[in-house]
From Swiss-Prot:
Part of the accessory SecA2/SecY2 system specifically required to export GspB, a serine-rich repeat cell wall protein encoded upstream in the same operon. GO terms for cellular component: cell envelope Sec protein transport complex; cytosol; plasma membrane. It is an enzyme of class 7 (translocase). This is Protein translocase subunit SecA 2. It is found in: Cell membrane; Cytoplasm. Disruption phenotype: Loss of export of cell wall protein GspB; glycosylated GspB accumulates in the cytoplasm.
């Protein structure tokens, strides 16, 4: 808090400078205010920097916000805006106006002409905020675009994306930006690229995107794999095994492994002598996937089974938000293993073509900043990973919400019935109620109980998100009852209806503590915005997932068989001190493990990051470089020929001839009888002659040097892309194989780095051979329009 005090004191000095321009700006005409943008751009060109422009620029935006929106940013919002410009995180409580705060740093950083972005967790918020704030930027002469559509089933065209990403200010989502970055780097020519260099970004709900979503990399999938028939077999095998006897599960690390007894049981089931021999690698991989499907991935917590008209499908859930992740599939066969577990039709397993984590995506920006209501508790991780401080901004009005102590019960039914009594009590008074649950299953249980009590309510979970923002916005009305999972409606203001403040405000009921304290704070923060009254209370049982997974062993002594009806009328509250500390200790253990997992994800992603940057840099060089490539191509051909001549052996002339037909030319003449296939010198001479002949034929056919250069680039590009896709897919498979299954005494991450490096070196070798094959074995033809069409092998 001492550090935050000095931050605030420094911010107030800058705030005073901004306020000193207030009278001047209010006296300007609209036209004079609009002219300020060109003035600022000229001052930048003359040598001033953004920090020097900040006081006056913020004063301009503040005045325009007032004239266009009728909203004059509070002092605390201006302080938050200063933090955002400095590349740090502004912690601002729910309802403090983060959307308006962002107008100031977005305008200032867009003045450089290099672009500024605001990234939100979902398209609804991006579209809403851009629509509401857009008039401010347009008034000031800046262009604003949204890189998402309301209908996500209709993707944006490349031409449209290029126009969008050239805008001064862009509102988008983290997933849309990530996929656009990956698509950009799969483009075959400059015409299909649309991004410019990443400059400045504000991430809304930054902790949700950079921390809670850190475990899920963005992946573009491509060509389907040959479908394995092992999924159902391994699902059946796992169902015959017993936990602790045949396999062990570490729920803290989410790791599962077979015991010696389990290995023997698997060998017996599969009719094998040695399960872990090299030829059984695929079986072991599928067994690992099946074990993880049953032990690590929980229905209605990690995924839901959604029924459509004809068939069911597995859709992943975001644990932090409770939202469906429609476009995301687990890689490496894990998704198919879960489908086998749930007995739904297996989807096609696809290859990963490109992948990036959110951490590495946002590190591509020159300057990164963010907003959240709950960043201070994880400031150390933001400092360590992103070198960003978290500054807690004071609220504009004092928070008068009443946060009651946790109500702890022994059993789950006691907790449910006690919380239901609380709901009935406040509902009878007319207070609006927002009831948060930790899973889809629990939200539906509460919904059923409320219906049984005759209490009308809205249910908001992953199975019902169409009206999410509207439901949350209306949840502050008199008598409203809303049941929601985790952090539904984050970013949507809840305004109290008439008469609600007199009753004590919105009542938030948490039906369990979540796996990190930030989500609990966010749940509480739904009530008591902008000085409104409010009430929050959590109900906990010793049987909650958090305590079962992270609590001490002694709480198991309190578990016993019972009938839920036993506790309906007389729930017993646990008041001893040791129970009070139980939850915070369990949360700290959970948060510590989550932090380690994120660090491990970053470590695994490091190999991919280095390899991706090297590969993309080479692709971009090819797309942008206009110089002749003859020397470079000749070096590659010479290298490949030398390798074939000196390192590859052929049984006879027919074997060597087959090699030539497959790799150098399908028009080559037969090998002369006197040719010595064991002479590297003769092999080199022959292959060099064939290569020169093929290249000369293609150059003659194309006639134009420009077309020939285009052909050369495309041949190299195809080789890079095909081999990079193989490498990305290999790294995904490798991580899946090493990260969750104990088969070796080595540290999995060390083994991964070594294998990943070896794989990359092998990829570069394959790539050179593929370049030669593409250059020599491709077919050229004219289409009916007279255009040259290139067919690569």
């Amino acid at each position: 808090m001492v550090k935050n005090f000095f931050h605030i004191r420094r911010l107030k000095k800058i705030l005073a400078k901004i306020k000193s321009f207030e009278k001047e700006m209010s006296s300007l005409s609209d036209l004079d205010l609009q002219k300020k943008t060109d003035e600022f751009k000229k001052r930048l060109a003359d040598g001033e920097n953004l920090d020097q422009l900040l006081p006056e620029a913020y004063a301009v935006v503040r005045e325009v916000d007032k004239r266009i929106l009728g909203l004059f940013p509070y002092d605390v919002q201006v302080m938050g805006a200063i933090v955002l410009h400095e590349g740090n995180i502004a912690e601002m409580a729910t309802g403090e106006g983060k959307t308006l705060t962002a107008t100031m740093p977005l305008y200032l950083n867009a003045l450089s002409g290099q672009g500024a972005m605001l990234v939100t967790p979902n398209s609804y918020l991006a579209l809403r905020d851009a629509k509401e704030m857009g008039p401010v930027y347009r008034f000031l002469g800046l262009t604003i675009e949204t890189a998402v559509r309301a209908d996500e089933s209709k993707p944006l065209e490349t031409k449209e994306k290029r126009r969008i990403y050239q805008a001064d200010i862009i509102y988008t989502t983290n997933s849309a930006l990530g996929f656009d970055y990956l698509i950009e780097n799969l483009a075959e020519n400059k015409k299909n690229q649309f991004l410019r260099e990443f400059n400045y970004v504000i991430i809304d709900e930054i902790d949700s995107i950079l921390l809670d979503s850190a475990q899920t990399p963005l992946i573009i999938s491509g060509a389907p794999r040959v479908q394995s028939n092992f999924y159902d077999m391994m699902n059946t095998l796992v169902q015959t095994l017993y936990e602790d006897e045949d396999y062990c599960y570490d729920d803290e690390k989410n790791e599962v492994w077979l015991t010696q007894k389990g290995i023997r049981a698997a060998e017996s089931f599969l009719g094998l002598n040695h399960l872990f021999s090299k030829e059984n690698q695929e079986l072991v991989r599928h067994l690992n996937l099946a074990l993880r499907a049953h032990m690590v991935y929980k229905k209605d917590q990690d995924y839901v089974v959604r029924q459509s008209e004809n068939e069911a499908e597995v859709v992943l859930l975001d644990r932090a938000t409770g939202r469906l992740m429609e476009l995301t599939r687990l890689q490496g066969g894990q998704h198919q293993a879960i489908e086998a577990k749930e007995h739904v039709k297996l989807t096609q397993e696809t290859r990963a073509m490109a992948s990036i984590t959110y951490q590495n995506l946002f590190k591509l920006f020159r300057k990164l900043s963010g907003m959240t209501g709950t960043g201070k508790v994880v400031e150390s991780e933001f400092l360590e990973t992103y070198s960003m401080s978290v500054v807690k901004i004071p609220t504009n009005c004092p928070v008068i919400r009443r946060d009651y102590p946790d109500q702890i019960y022994q059993t789950l039914p006691e907790k449910v019935f006690a919380s239901l009594d609380e709901v009935k009590h406040y509902h009878a008074k007319g207070n609006p109620l927002l009831i948060f649950t930790g899973s889809v299953e629990m939200s539906e249980i509460y919904s059923s109980l409320l219906l049984r009590e005759g209490i009308a309510h809205n249910l908001l979970n992953a199975n019902n998100v169409a009206r999410e923002a509207q439901m949350i916005a209306e949840s502050g009305q008199l008598g409203a009852v809303t049941v929601a999972t985790s952090m539904a409606g984050r970013g949507t203001d809840i305004k109290l209806g008439p008469g609600v403040a007199d009753l004590g405000g919105l009542v938030v009921i948490g039906t369990e503590r979540m796996e990190n304290h930030r989500i609990d704070l966010q749940i509480r923060g739904r009530s008591g915005r902008q000085g409104d009254p409010g009430i929050s209370k959590f109900f906990i049982s010793l049987e909650d997932d958090l305590l079962k997974k992270w609590g001490p062993d002694w709480i198991k002594n309190f578990y016993r068989d019972y009938s839920p009806e036993d506790f309906k009328n007389n729930p017993i509250l646990l008041k001893q001190r040791r129970f009070k500390k139980l939850v915070s200790k369990a949360q700290k253990a959970s948060e510590g493990n989550a932090k380690l997992s994120r660090r491990l994800t970053l470590e695994y992603a490091q190999s991919m990051k280095i390899q991706r940057e090297l590969t993309y840099a080479e692709r971009n060089r090819l797309l942008e470089d206009t110089n002749e490539m003859e020397e470079e191509i000749n070096r590659v051909i010479e290298y490949v020929i030398k390798q074939v001549a000196y390192e590859q052996s052929f049984e006879n002339r027919a074997d060597f001839y087959r090699f030539i037909l497959h790799h150098f030319s399908n028009r080559a003449e037969r090998i002369p009888q006197e040719f010595d296939i064991h002479s590297p010198k003769e092999v080199s001479h022959l292959l060099q002659a064939i290569a020169e002949q093929e290249l000369l034929a293609k150059k003659s056919y194309l006639k134009s040097d420009k077309l020939y250069s285009q052909f050369q680039r495309l041949a190299i590009l195809k080789a890079i892309d095909e081999n990079w896709v193989e490498q990305v897919d290999y790294l995904q498979q490798l991580k899946s194989a090493l990260s969750g299954f104990h088969t070796s005494n080595k540290k999995p991450i060390v083994e991964y780095y070594q294998e990943a490096y070896d794989g990359f070196e092998y990829m570069k070798e394959r790539m050179k051979h593929q370049i030669v094959k593409n250059l020599l074995m491709s077919e050229l033809a004219l289409n009916p329009k007279g255009e040259v069409v290139m067919y690569f092998p």
